[in-house]
Amino acid sequence: MKIAELNLPQALKDFYTGSGIPELYPPQAEAIRQGLLDGKNLLAAIPTASGKTLLAEMAMLKSIAEGGKAIYIVPLKALASEKYDRFLEFSKLPIKPDGVKVGIATGDFDSRDEYLGEKDIIVATSEKTDSLLRNGASWLSGLSVVVADEVHLIDSPNRGPTLEVTLAKLRKINVNLQILALSATIGNAKALAKWMDAALVQSEWRPTTLKEGVFYGRAITFKKEKRTVNNAGPDEVNSLVADTLEEGGQCLVFANTRKSSESIAQKVARSLSKKLQPAEKEQLAKLKQDVLRHAETDTCEKLAECVGNGVAFHHAGLKGEHRRIVEDGFRQNILKVIACTPTLAAGLNLPARRVIIRDYKRFDVNYGSVPIPVLEYKQMAGRAGRPRLDPYGEAVLIAKNYDEFGELMENYINADPEHITSKLGTEPAMRAHALSAVATDFCRSRQDLKAFMDTTFFAYQRGDLSHVIDNVLNFLLEENMIIESKGGSLKATDLGSLVSKLYIDPLSAALIAEGLEKAKKRPDVAEFGLLHLICSTPDVKSLYLRRGDYSWIIRYADEHASDFLSDVPDSYGDDVEFEQFLAGVKTAALAEMWINEKSEEAITTFFNIGPGDIRNLMETCTWLMHGTAEISALLGAPATRTARELAIRIENGASRELLDLITLKGVGRVRARKLYDAGYTSRDKLKAAEIPAIAAIPGIGDKLAVSIMSQLGRKVDHTPPETEEQPQVSGQSTLFSFDG
């Protein structure tokens, strides 16, 4: 089916044909026949790289040309940025007089973001979309198309319930809405399509042939052929990587832990470094410098060394800047190999000639080492083969013995993906969504709420949710977040409305409110008490306790005994409860290190985590501390000012004395400290300074000095020279002392 034949605006057809896409892939053509361009709901359950995004673009842009508006829902912020960048390419498309306006929404969860109403395409995470619904964003009722990318993640215990409820709500508020769901190949696609009232396009077709096999005995056994790996040595991964690179391909290597991915990258880098050409070394040296420009920890320096040899590792413990450098370097074929954890398979567009799945088992805290689902394997395998660049793609598992070889062939290569199931039917999943439905007047009684929940995928699969709903509503009543009249109508209290808008778990809010009531009886509220309070909530993923942690954490808890705003369990009582308490103390200790300006290196070393983990954890803590300040203000507790200051300090990793400087754009924790130590302890002192004096401070430079003065409202005549801005450098490097 030719692009030129489609019922699309001519400008869009010209755009695609001019981009080298003259005709559709078979699954895309089937989607057209099923009514994609006629406003019909559609579920496309097709492999990676078979053109799902193009389906979304055509549906959205045709609707926009007719006066509509679209939202593109993704599971990850990184994927949102990738799609946003792609859709910006349509901004000058003359299908509307003023072009196509694109927006992105991944930030604060307590805003309506009404400015997005001016956009034609909005890219958002499912959590952000849910929060926009809770905060009453008026433009949502004007949507004509909703695209749900990676919709099979309804199966995820963490993200699934939010995506499921969000889709159900959007369908209810706009009956003419077209829903386009994009999914990996799943076992029960028909059931998911039926729930959505959608036509189903299901296919195994790929533009690049995918060969799936198992490496054992110096050969890869595929379904229909066997291939010997030349010069295979004792290290299977190195052998498979070398074999791919000799043919001009790139490799992704999936490992089950961050440490394993780093170890693999280092081994492959040592091997590859001897084979690099001078021109390649020059490109890689530049990329290495890009990594070092943002380096503050051993992990970053380790990454830089690997990158200098054409290899990288990629996991959630890396800083966002480093992940982007790695991804871009791989897309540009400067980096040849990435060793990564399975998070890379969750949507990011980074295909490679060969995908090596080194580990097919992962550790589960309840069951030990367990095999990964077939669906997860298929997601990783689907990254093999770059369309129009590779003649084929290969996904290779590694067997350690003959029995394992047979198991891998049967359980993965020749297996079908599992059915996905809704995870909405638990009280933790239901709490926030029930409160949201009541707080937004979406549901005004128990009957309303049950009727709405009957429209979810959970109800479609498993039936009645009444018992769970009743338990959750009773909890919300007990915690004074909703009230129920004698006539049965439900209404949110001021606390309930606030909690819903803040987008935090009602149980977290209940624990925070309880702690703040205790604060009313204290002469003052300790910072550590507030840090521990938020780190003890279900919204914060507490740090794991290691064997060597117990003595210092118990000692530290004793030193802060008078600070705690939550009950301190008896160490001789419930072991689980006491361990949870200690985990909260450990996590709060990390937050305290962060706001006391300890270096990332000190924190990552002491707590054995990655720099990306610090950022992710502090982002959550910032939001919860902001929520704590809002709840404190509502309850009239004495913690409001302290909590507001702490939220700013956690966000920036700064001491209290830097509050006046830290909120200046471009001034991070390290630069603020340098300014303060140079005598510029306030904005007034900074404003009175001479620009050259500010620029001379290490890490500032002319460009930032001019920017700072402009932000302070000072007239600037100084023109900075055209020099590269100095990178931020690491500050303190001493390990955290628990002696006060």
Curated annotation (Swiss-Prot):
CDD domains: DEXHc_archSki2, SF2_C_Ski2
Motif DEAH box location, chain numbering: 149-152
Pfam families: DEAD, Helicase_C, Helicase_dom4_arc, HHH_5, HTH_61
Superkingdom as given in the UniProt entry: Archaea
Residue ranges of the region described as Disordered: 716-740
GO molecular-function terms, A-Z: 3'-5' DNA helicase activity; ATP binding; ATP hydrolysis activity; DNA binding
Protein name as catalogued: ATP-dependent DNA helicase Hel308
Gene name, Swiss-Prot/TrEMBL: hel308
